[in-house]
Amino acid sequence: MPETPFVTFTGVVAGYGGGDVLKNVDFSVAQGGVTCIVGPNGSGKSTLLKTVSGLVKPRLGEIWFKGQNLVGKSPREILKMGIVQVPQNHSLFREMTVEQNVELGAFLERDKRVIAERLERIRTMFPIVAERAKDKAGALSGGQQRLVEFARCLMLEPDLVVLDEPSMGLDPKTLKIMFATIKMMNEAGRTVLLVEQNARQALKLSHHGVVLENGRVRLTGTGREVLDNPEIGALYLGGSLEEASHAASEKGHS
């Protein structure tokens, strides 16, 4: 895997009116990989993603992407730079067809021939776009809508895809398809940064993992290293309390 820093967080402090949620966050996202952020509720995971897409402006610090500081740039400017975020909540226009929704992803492109070529590639990558092209988006299940949202974001041909809890509300069958789709997007050349409630499954396909706790980076490593850490596994990934206690004891005596 390439290890070239693609996105770099340096001393990022950000939050809302009630105070700081992110507290001096430092880490890098490697180019060409999948990076998964895990941690307890309220640790700042979704806020971190919003700083990348311009929805939350850091109070302090810098976020570098391809040689440019994202801090202070609008969401539209960031979109034009090649960063697309798929929101946690479904965002399709229910009364428009699947194909119309997907085409909206290319709104920055004015050449109709280019749009048609992209749409043809998307149909190949996402069978649902071809099979349900003329159906209203509102007729799709939640999982099907999520796949169409993935397809729409790729119409922009982004360099970085940001995913906030993409598996939320999905049934086991669609969940499997969703993770396979994330892997496919990455293999197609997209760098992926995601927050995912099914952390174990997400870390298995991730090249890198970041653990947030109380707005700070507690641990970084490969996806496998984070997954195999007994203390992290017990606290955030559904492991046993005995594992956490044993890991903490060993750490205290090391």
What do the PLM-derived regions correspond to, one by one?
Residues 17, 73, 98-117, 125-127, ...:
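ABC-type ATPase nucleotide-binding domains, specifically the catalytic core motifs of the NBD
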Residues 38-40:
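The feature captures the beta-strand-to-loop junction immediately N-terminal to the Walker
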Residues 53:
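Helix-to-loop junction immediately C-terminal to a conserved catalytic motif
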Residues 61-69, 81, 115-119, 221:
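Conserved ABC transporter NBD signature motif
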Residues 136-140:
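Conserved ABC ATPase signature
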Residues 153-154:
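ABC ATPase C-loop
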Residues 157:
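Conserved catalytic motifs of ABC-family nucleotide-binding domains
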